[in-house]
Amino acid sequence: MSDSKKSATVVMPRWRQYWVLTKPRVTQLAVFCAVIGMFLATPGMVPYPVLFGGIVGIWLLAGAAFAVNCLIEQAVDAKMKRTSWRPSATGEVTPLHIIIFSIILGSLGMIILWNFCNPLTMWLTLATFVGYAVIYTWLLKPATPQNIVIGGLSGAMPPALGWAAVTNTLSAEAWHLVLIIFVWTPPHFWALALYRRDDYVQSGLPMLPVTHGERFTLLNIVLYTLILIAATMLPYIYGMSGMVYLISAIILGLLFLAYVVALFISYSDALAKKTFRFSITYLSLLFAALLVDHYFL
């Protein structure tokens, strides 16, 4: 069920209150990208302890980061229709309990990553936690409309975390994957911010559609999508993938571009929502194409 369909008047079971604080759908996408990074880092099978340890450890630390995000944005979330149902915003889960919950998740995640993967992965994941929960959420998001660009690195790190879990290094190939997510994030998020701009006006957060208007935001979405399409060529150019990935990346990129150009020409909230949803499908299929090309072709 989407955020917009939730209601602050509905009392969730206690376990689910904590579960939603981890933003499970976003966490799933992050872990998926981390797993792709693991498999792309080796020509063979990822060792099972590393695979499962990496999945669980990264999931736990990501969940902890999102819980801290909910805590910091408690007052902001309460003002927004999309997020007012969250247990942190309604007060069903107290700040102290969120802090304890985040410490438990984060500590377990660090222990698992240290023991099943390697210290590098643990420290990188912890740095990503700090980058998202503190630098982005606390410092950048309320300060600048370029928050999602400047703070986007933390959200783009999962493939590098997966790569490091397997190789105990960070090669150029890992950073190619990070770059793809980094330049994907602005058009993905700004599509959401456009059709939720009234929410962001209420929140007081300086999101680009609020501070610079619809047309400027749409232009930036188009520009970043073009940069994204160029960035997705890097895995092929540098020999990480073959023709199957290249063709998939071109087709998916043109589809994404068609959405954003249509949005630029004739904006509607409904089309912005479709563009936002397709952006998630786009990233999932793009990374799946990398995996298929790597192992099966």
From Swiss-Prot:
Main location: membrane
Protein's GO biological process: heme O biosynthetic process
Topology of this chain in the membrane: Multi-pass membrane protein
EC numbers, comma separated: 2.5.1.141
Cysteine disulfide links: none
UniProt pathway: Porphyrin-containing compound metabolism; heme O biosynthesis; heme O from protoheme: step 1/1
Domain of life, per lineage: Bacteria
MF terms in GO: protoheme IX farnesyltransferase activity
Transmembrane segments: 26-46, 48-68, 96-116, 120-140, 147-167, 174-194, 218-238, 245-265, 276-296
Location(s) in or outside the cell: Cell inner membrane
Catalytic reactions on record: heme b + (2E,6E)-farnesyl diphosphate + H2O = Fe(II)-heme o + diphosphate
Keywords, ordered alphabetically: Cell inner membrane, Cell membrane, Heme biosynthesis, Membrane, Transferase, Transmembrane, Transmembrane helix
GO cellular component, one term: plasma membrane
Catalytic EC class: transferase
Homology family: Belongs to the UbiA prenyltransferase family. Protoheme IX farnesyltransferase subfamily.
NCBIfam families (UniProt xref): cyoE_ctaB, PRK04375.1-2
Function of the molecule: Converts heme B (protoheme IX) to heme O by substitution of the vinyl group on carbon 2 of heme B porphyrin ring with a hydroxyethyl farnesyl side group.
Record's miscellaneous remark: Carbon 2 of the heme B porphyrin ring is defined according to the Fischer nomenclature.
Protein name: Protoheme IX farnesyltransferase
The organism of origin for this protein: Polynucleobacter necessarius subsp. necessarius (strain STIR1)
Gene: ctaB
